[in-house]
Amino acid sequence: MMESGEALLKKLDGRLSGLRGRLTPDTGMDKITWFRAGGPAQVLFQPSDEEDLSAFLKAVPEEIPLLVVGIGSNLLVRDGGVPGFVVRLSAKGFGEVEQVCDTQLRAGAAAPDKRVAAAALEAGLAGFHFYHGIPGGVGGALRMNAGANGVETRERVVEVRALDRKGEVHVLSNADMGYAYRHSSASPDLIFTSVLFEGVPGERDDIRRAMDEVQHHRETVQPVREKTGGSTFKNPEGTSAWKEIDKAGCRGLRVGGAQMSEMHCNFMINTGNATGHDLETLGETVRARVFENSGIRLHWEIKRLGLFREGEQIEEFLGKII
């Protein structure tokens, strides 16, 4: 069991007094994540801007755990909470999207992906329509090379601006990001703050039509009005995660308040009162059944974080097969 957030702040004894952002101890992560489940952040920090974030990083000892979140999609928080600091990049300080030249946009890491798509439409830049259908933010898209409809984030990235744990600025090229399918090999200690994107001049009517098609597809096949973190598992090579989940009989499967969506069975939903334990147990049950059925090991696309409550540890594949 972790100590209180107030106790952690007291240990730092005024080192954070010059910050302009908001420090909130013992904040429920269920208020932040799209699953609306999970335990508290020991301390939540919402920096005002990149300068404020840099000052915070310089003040916090590196041995204190630190986790960065954006708009809260694609996150499953365990019920024991998240120790140390959770840094939430706010839309006010990190959510702007602006056109910087004929073919380029600069976007803050907390900007919703849909805002990037809208800005690209306004600028007459093609190649961003896929963001209109991704329920997440730019920072997460950069970290996991988010993609949809046959397009990936890496195809649009020119350079990424980031801070390290010492508060120093780094500028990473596309190659530095080390992109692969739903993955970047950039150091996990780097905090992305903004990105420079490159688009292709296009006709606004064509761009709008592509965005409408993405939106229609999403509303037709995905549970967009449910409490969900998006796609639960990465697609295995040569097949789709949802197909393997369906073949294993897991469509609609429930654990407590968690359920694999009837509409799209690679989407896990909180039906109303799911705990982090319910959600993760459901996910590991699905992994076990898929492996038993087809020999395929599904890998989580949703990021799981935090501590288990005492006695609620969950083994991979529920310990059945590994």
UniProtKB/Swiss-Prot annotation:
GO terms for molecular function: FAD binding; UDP-N-acetylmuramate dehydrogenase activity. It is found in: Cytoplasm. The active site is at R182, S231, E301. Pathway: Cell wall biogenesis; peptidoglycan biosynthesis. One of its GO terms (cellular component) is cytosol. Coiled coil: none annotated. Keywords: Cell cycle, Cell division, Cell shape, Cell wall biogenesis/degradation, Cytoplasm, FAD, Flavoprotein, NADP, Oxidoreductase, Peptidoglycan synthesis. Its cofactor is FAD. Gene3D superfamilies: 3.30.465.10, UDP-N-acetylenolpyruvoylglucosamine reductase, C-terminal domain, Uridine Diphospho-n-acetylenolpyruvylglucosamine Reductase, domain 2. Belongs to the MurB family. This is UDP-N-acetylenolpyruvoylglucosamine reductase.
